[in-house]
Amino acid sequence: VALVVTALTGGLGIQGMLELLGTSFVNNRGMAIFIIIMLATGTLERNGLKESAASLIKRFKKVSAGMIVDIYGIFRMIFAAFNVSFGGVAGFVRPIILPMALGTIESKGLEVHPKHEEELKGMASAMENVCWFFGQVLFIGGAGALLVQSTLKDLGYDVTLGQLALVEVPVAITALVVASVYFYLKEKKLAKKYYPGKGQ
């Protein structure tokens, strides 16, 4: 009602209102996709997504929480190179990766320490950010690559998107390796701290 009244009093009319609404939707479709992902994630969580992810990983006794974060990082980097988004921290890390990481601890008969859980949230979120940040520039024509290209052009460097992607490959691989090693070692240290003598 408020939309129609505002359009009519503003002089747009019904046709102008519908045109503006359609144009705004098309121009902001990324936001619409974000909202749809959040709704789908919420629905799946309510119907047992977290529990399914945790029970799946409990079958693998040798896997650690750090390994889950690292494996996710590898897949995230590969998909980021093709500009495929998983929904970020809220859409994928929180409902799927975190329960899997916590499931590795529970599979060893341990109760997850609250501080360890918070650390794992940070590690998984950081891995998402590192891999998305460095991986999206590998996609030729992606927003990240275009931003870097335009910034370099303003600084006097004329580079093609292909050249930029080639230069970015070793940078992305290095970022992934450094992050993976860091999170793996950090998680091992945290496991010893929070579960001493438990073989975690």
Predicted segments, located by residue:
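Hydrophobic transmembrane alpha-helices of multi-pass solute/ion transporters
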Residues: 1-39, 43, 52-56, 200
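Hydrophobic core segments of alpha-helical transmembrane domains in multi-pass membrane transport
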Residues: 2-9, 37-41, 72-80, 146-150, ...
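Short helix-coil transition sites and intra-membrane helix breaks within transmembrane domains
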Residues: 29-30, 42-51, 81-98, 133-142
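Hydrophobic alpha-helical transmembrane segments of multi-pass integral membrane proteins
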Residues: 60-105
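Alpha-helical transmembrane segments of multi-pass membrane proteins
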Residues: 66-81, 109-135, 159-173
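Juxtamembrane and boundary regions of transmembrane helices in multi-pass small-molecule transporters
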Residues: 89, 151-200
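Membrane-interfacial helix-loop connectors
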Residues: 90-115, 124, 142-162
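Intrinsically disordered, low-complexity non-transmembrane regions of multi-pass membrane transporters
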Residues: 102-123, 184-200
